[in-house]
Amino acid sequence: MLALRKTLLHGRLPAAPPAAAAAAIASRIPALLRRLSSSPGDGQGGDEWGSSWSTGITKEHFDGSDAAVGRPVTSPSKPVSPELAAVRAMDEEDEIFRAMERDNREAKAYVDSWGDRMRETCELLKQVREPGSRGSYLKDSEKQEMYRLHKEDPETYTVERLAKDFRVMRQRVHAILWLKEMEEEEERKLGKPLDDSVEVLLDSCPEFFNSHDREFHVASLPYKPDFKVMPEGWDGTTRDPDEVLYEISMKEDQMLYEEFVQRLQFNKKKVAGEVKCHKYSRRRPDDGWTYMVEKLGVQSKRGSGGGWKFASLPDGSSRPLNDMEKMYVKRETPKRRRRIMAPFK
């Protein structure tokens, strides 16, 4: 590229000088430099070195009205040779190419990072749409530790504390404790430990699963305008939407937790055989049926409006409801709220 530019500037490649001519030029260089850098002073062949400064720098240089030394300034009216114009065009093209390469590198790095950004966005959206999905895997060793702590000291290591320490939902803690309790009972019946090869394999390869990280419930709020008549003297401030969403999520999470515990207790009694759910268990006993009677209140209302329930025995006597019957009544009580379900399902 440099040789091409020199060719364009000079029009041709310089020929190598002969040896004799080169020696003559070399002998004349000191005299030529002396002649350019000095001028005769007193006529006796002396050199006046101080006058050499006037040959290169003038008053305009110090006043700032002239260009600096060594920087050629092209006048607008001065014609430019085709060779110089071609070299300038090539410099501009090189600068454009370098800028394009730099932009291409930045664009490639930005596009390559989109894969990680999309994965992070999908994880966040999945967490919002399906609460608790980030805690899809919990090691079996952690489950064993959770059950051991609760069994040794249930007063200290409650369900709430275990859920906080292991960063999982309270419903999951209940399920894990019941699962480990059933496994321990099964090992006691068999007289040997259960096969845990699958759990060991999963614990040894945790990179194939998403580690748990703070499960929680996120409420699904309707996206519609909410118009309210504000009182007189309202300053125009409103509550933070995130704070409102957090409070609603906590209320719904508490309701879901209570319903889960209720269903879990019923399933435990069902597994233990205390709940009769097949058709042969519904035959009439020899001494007769036991009925649940609900007495109306003062204003002829049922349930929480003033009525109370009791059991009527076949012999005509009555008694209060036991724990099993209270559980049945609570399961049959309708829930006066909207159905809580995960969004986008």
Curated annotation (Swiss-Prot):
One of its GO terms (cellular component) is mitochondrion. Signal peptide: none annotated. InterPro entries: GCD1_mitochondrial. It is found in: Mitochondrion. Keywords: Developmental protein, Mitochondrion, Transit peptide. The keyword Mitochondrion applies. GO terms for biological process: cell communication; embryo development ending in seed dormancy; endosperm cellularization; endosperm development; gametophyte development; mitochondrial membrane organization; nucleus localization; pollen development. It comes from the Eukaryota. Its main location: mitochondrion. Residues 1-43 form a transit peptide. Residues 36-82 are annotated as: Disordered. Essential for fertility (male and female gametophyte functions and development). Required for the integrity of female gametic mitochondria. Involved in embryo apical-basal patterning, and particularly dorsal-ventral patterning, during early embryogenesis, and endosperm free nucleus positioning and development as well as early endosperm development, probably by modulating the expression pattern of related genes (e.g. AL1, MYB3/AL2, CYP78A13/GE, PNH1, HAZ1, MPK6 and OSH1). This is Protein GAMETE CELL DEFECTIVE 1, mitochondrial. It comes from Oryza sativa subsp. indica (Rice).
